[in-house]
Amino acid sequence: MRSRAWPLLIVAVALACGPVPGGSLAGEVRPPPAAWSEVIDGDRAICEIESRPADPHSIQLECFVRDGALYVQSHRWALASWWPVTSWAAIWIEHPETRVRIGDAIYELRAERVTAPAERGAVLAARGYDPVPDGIVLFRFAPRT
């Protein structure tokens, strides 16, 4: 009986140890680079992203570069009505002004939801999804205007 409890305990602990949102990010604000390869080693990096300036909310996500653009993606249930909390993806849809920290630098960017089927499909297929599932929310970062 004890041997059956260990896998359940491990799963429970793993689920409880998810990313914990934080508040405002600190660091030097810099203009967005001409090419994200100037600041990201390879094609991906862990980024800290702050949104909702009136009530700052920050999280860590894997950012990735594709065709020169910087992206992030949600899990496939981020906007599901049954999801127990308001996901960062829902927050960004309402408040797209973000601050992205990579290393010590902060870039003030706009998180643009990618809904065009061709771009969304190509980016998520390059991430290994075959077929590309519904529900994943994809954002491309753009300079603020």
Where are these regions (language model features)?
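Bacterial N-terminal signal peptides that target proteins for export
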Residues: 1-7
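C-terminal motif of bacterial Sec signal peptides marking the signal peptidase cleavage site
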Residues: 13-16
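Short, surface-exposed loop and linker segments with low hydrophobicity and enrichment for Pro/Ser/Thr
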Residues: 39-41, 66, 132-134
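Short beta-strand segments
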Residues: 43-80
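Short, structured beta-strand-loop surface elements
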Residues: 56-58, 77-145
